[in-house]
Amino acid sequence: MNITQILSQELSATAAQITAAVELLDDGATVPFIARYRKEATGGLDDTQLRRLAERLQYLRELEERKAVVLKSIEEQGKLSDDLRAQIEAADNKTALEDLYLPYKPKRRTKAQIAREHGLQPLADVLLAEQSQDVEAAAQGYLNENVPDAKAALDGARAILMEQFAEDAELIGTLRDKLWNEAEIHAQVVEGKETEGEKFSDYFDHREPVRTMPSHRALAVLRGRNEGVLNIALKYQPDDTPITRQSEYEQIIACRFKVSDGHKWLRDTVRLTWRAKIFLSLELEALGRLKEAADTDAITVFARNLKDLLLVAPAGRLTTLGLDPGYRNGVKCAVVDDTGKLLDTVIVYLHQENNMLATLSRLIKQHGVKLIAIGNGTASRETDKIAGELVRGMPEMGLHKIVVSEAGASIYSASELAAREFPDLDVSLRGAVSIARRLQDPLAELVKIDPKSIGVGQYQHDVNQNQLAKSLDAVVEDCVNAVGVDVNTASAPLLARISGLNQTLAQNIVAYRDENGAFDSRKKLLKVPRLGEKTFEQAAGFLRINGGKEPLDASAVHPEAYPVVAKMLAQQGISAAELIGNRERVKQIKASDFTDERFGLPTILDILSELEKPGRDPRGEFQTASFAEGIHEISDLQVGMILEGVVSNVANFGAFVDIGVHQDGLVHISALSNKFVQDPREVVKAGDVVKVKVLEVDAARKRIALTMRLDDEPGGAKHKMPSENRSRERTAGRKPQRNDRAPANSAMADAFAKLKR
């Protein structure tokens, strides 16, 4: 197996690109560094391709290591033929490899092994080869002290044949593929659990093809099983099929071993092999495969939403008042300056409105507040109303109020990091600081919180946690490096996400900065303890120094490319300060004049783009939603209302939108646009401000159906999208339920158990 060739085919890249990328990864280079500064070597592979390459490279190398172990084991047994070696070396996945190894894998003594020890292998061979109808007569010649009668002999021979059938790698592969492609998953409610498991009611009698089951339904059904509400099984033939009828799977086994139709004993052996041995194993494997596929899908959705949220445009460096709403414990307030430094805190109470207005007015005037960030949790609407009065009552301050997600703020408040940052500040007030800062710069603040706590995941607690953490860490790393950080203001958690750095180095940078003052050049980073040349190479391009000795230090131009810029300056006869940001002068530079063996055209073009707009931020322009006045609770909603909201989550079946009523509404994929939508992310992403119409409100179940097709009429035929409901009703084998809900509700059943858990 040629790993380079496999990766080349999977990534649609040349062997040279793959080889270069693998060498860089093996040498310790990070994905952001390779994607940004080694484009010539990799032929421009982006971070997504490089992440996939690194993941597959690890898998294929593990596969090669496992092959070596398997080959050695079989060789030591003296059973390694040239044909078997070729099959093992050609195996392109771990499942196929283990199928080949199964007959030779050391195992505890089985019934088949005991039967062989008792001399029954020849009997099994004779019965299969000759297929004599008088099996008892055939068994008489194999009786001994360990095999007292014909029944014992035949039982032993059957055990040998069942093991032989079940360990045929090619056969198992065929049956596995057929079962996956044709079987249905059947979910049924556990008797007596109907009331307790009401949230899983859509799956009380549910059938659908396992191969095409969407991830959100798969995870919902699996959660129902784990909570003891649902029983699930794989069905490979109709329930009313007579037990004596041979299934297609049994026919395949019989055909493989040339078992005649008229040989009852061998047919029974085949049936037992399938039903008691092979199917049970493949069923577990298929459900595991379903879970793995659903995990991957859900993690991909989570990662995409997280990326969108992290790359939401910052409000900017403005003094901000953060409000963490609450009733009984009051509204926690914190003022931070334009750099995020804490200036003041106070707790006010909604039931003391006049005092609250006076206190906040004083804070705003005293510190020159420009932005008010309001957490979107309990009492958010009441707090927002007070903030609105402040904005209207203090026009001279030029105030703006914005409701922001407070997901994870309480977790940050109680974290060790928050305790180190604010050792003398009450835990409840730390959340207000986080809310203020995440408005100023969402990325810089959200990196302090475990990504799983940010609240943009689909069944995040049900998926593989190691895989989830790895994927989300990669997203955070890519986002931080795409934006870059100011080394003189960045926190240690933010610096730790920079290419080449870790927690220790990040803390060392902050400690050096605190002791020696701001860095005035990138070169000074080399004075930080344990930050050597290799780390500097990986990190420097993503670290910005504004107002330093070298103007290029404020850009994404890597220090290794400064000599190229020097040549450009010499050609133009101007200084760096005169060129940087001067679009007209940059346009006069011909990229091809500066390419050489080390720096190709992609790098030169990147340098010119950076010179044209140094330190450019890939995040878009800051925008906010204006929630409708008087709409505070789900009970305030009316069908037909057109509202503005913020996309909080994007799933494969649609988008969840925060419209300010403490319960996100769902825009089903069919209601996102007047044209066909394959992927909701083609239309929206987390953080987008959108206009929606209310189609249906189910206050009891806390479900809100929305549409972005503002000309849709509630209950109108043109927006009834029955494909999903009909397929579910058809496969469930039951009478379709009355469908008097808007189409968006067709996907809300299990998914509306709010993704943010």
Swiss-Prot record:
Q: Name one GO molecular function term.
A: mRNA binding
tRNA processing keyword on record: no
Q: Which GO terms describe its biological process?
A: nucleobase-containing compound metabolic process; translation
State the InterPro entries in the record: HHH_9, NA-bd_OB-fold, Ribos_protein_bS1-like, RNaseH-like_sf, RuvA_2-like, S1_domain, S1_Tex, Tex-like_central_region
List, alphabetically, the GO terms of the cellular component aspect.
Answer: cytosol
Q: Which UniProt keywords apply?
A: RNA-binding
Q: Where is the S1 motif domain?
A: 640-709
**Record's SMART domains?**
S1, YqgFc
Task: Please indicate which superkingdom the organism of origin belongs to.
Answer: Bacteria
Q: Which residues form the signal peptide?
A: none
Q: Where is this region: Disordered?
A: 711-757
Q: What is the protein name stated in its UniProt record?
A: Uncharacterized protein NMB0075
Task: Give the organism the record lists.
Answer: Neisseria meningitidis serogroup B (strain ATCC BAA-335 / MC58)
